């Protein structure tokens, strides 16, 4: 709550100085919710990209951020038909537009560049198509050392090596875990 509160204050200061015609928010982070809420309170039209995505798990902070951002936004860009249906059920269908998934577009745009970059694979002696890529940063998975240790222990038993670009949040907890017996997990800097 403190982080979001600070964002609300900071975003409000910026919006009052800049006076934008429109605020665009993206995804499901705390800043997404803070941006949509602040703009709405200041009567600035707001767009939410990736609207309507739902896990239906209110225990996830991201779910609260998604639902809130959609409620506060004037225009909702939904990536999928299912997201459109969710918005319809929530009474937000009149504000929603099916736009496609910009994450998929970004992936397609960068596949060529990604396939050309083998530096990280070479550094860890990994072969294309013969490793798993792990991203792990959700608080429920990484904030508790025992939970993180259990996850890594299971991943260490996989048939291929695991390439693990380390998120800053995960790094804090990982420092308290003994990684000596986890030869199958290759930690690297964020990509």
Language-model features, listed with the residues they occupy:
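Donor-nucleotide binding loops and adjacent catalytic segments primarily
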Residues: 1, 115-191
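Active-site and donor-binding regions of nucleotide-sugar-utilizing enzymes
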Residues: 1-91
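Short active-site oxyanion
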Residues: 21-22, 72-75, 94-95, 159-162, ...
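General beta-strand structural signal in soluble alpha/beta enzymes
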Residues: 25, 48, 77-79, 97-99, ...
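Phosphate- and divalent-cation-binding pockets in alpha/beta enzyme and binding domains
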Residues: 33-34, 86, 106, 172-174
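Short beta-strands and strand-loop turn motifs
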Residues: 46-52, 100, 133-136, 165
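Short, acidic/turn-prone active-site loops that include or flank metal/cofactor-
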Residues: 51-55, 101-102, 189-191
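A nucleotide-sugar donor-handling region in carbohydrate enzymes
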Residues: 72-147
């Amino acid at each position: 709550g403190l982080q979001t509160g600070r964002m609300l204050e900071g975003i409000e200061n910026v919006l009052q100085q800049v006076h934008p015609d429109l605020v665009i928010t993206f995804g499901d982070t705390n800043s997404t919710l803070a941006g949509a809420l602040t703009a709405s309170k200041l009567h600035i039209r707001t767009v939410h990209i990736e609207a309507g995505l739902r896990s239906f798990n209110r225990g996830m902070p991201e779910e609260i951020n998604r639902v809130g951002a959609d409620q506060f936004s004037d225009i909702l860009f939904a990536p999928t038909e299912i997201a459109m249906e969710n918005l319809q059920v929530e009474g937000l269908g009149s504000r929603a537009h099916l736009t496609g998934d910009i994450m998929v577009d970004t992936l397609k745009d960068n596949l060529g560049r990604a396939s050309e970059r083998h530096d990280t694979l070479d550094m860890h002696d990994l072969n294309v198509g013969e490793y798993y890529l792990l991203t792990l940063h959700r608080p429920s998975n990484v904030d508790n050392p025992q939970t993180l240790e259990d996850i890594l222990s299971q991943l260490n038993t996989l048939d291929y090596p695991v390439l693990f670009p380390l998120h800053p949040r995960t790094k804090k907890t990982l420092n308290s875990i003994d990684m000596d017996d986890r030869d199958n997990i290759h930690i690297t800097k964020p990509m």
